[in-house]
């Protein structure tokens, strides 16, 4: 009985740990996009999650706002577009007329055994988006892309492009490719 309880507790801790890794990966990408919007002098305001409106961008408060990223459901940009955060898709790139221009799925898990499952979850989210917005750009950012997952992603018409999160963080060229793509989508 005790062994069963310990096994169950271990699985719960493992699951919670994996969820935390995924949540943190999303926050990394959210912060990266906000910092890039600041660099491009495009950030206007943070959109509060609790429905109390917007919080104007203030350079003096940026680090505090980035540290409390979960309090926001997105940001508004100078060209009247928005970057919105949610659970599915993880990030939406929304145009002036509330049209979805693109979506980003962030898969932060690093266990190779779960790579196909994460790919499948992203694909499902992208299919849902494309039913509503057939011209939307779909971007997968994953920490672990196995050869099998890469082969499927390369053949998958629902995924416009994909990036390895570790490469985006470590390699300036990959970072630049990602942000250029995202901000070109937002410029429509």
Pin down the residues of each PLM region.
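Interdomain/boundary linker segments immediately adjacent to catalytic/signaling cores
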Residues: 1-53
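Catalytic core segments in nucleotide and nucleic-acid processing enzymes
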Residues: 45-188
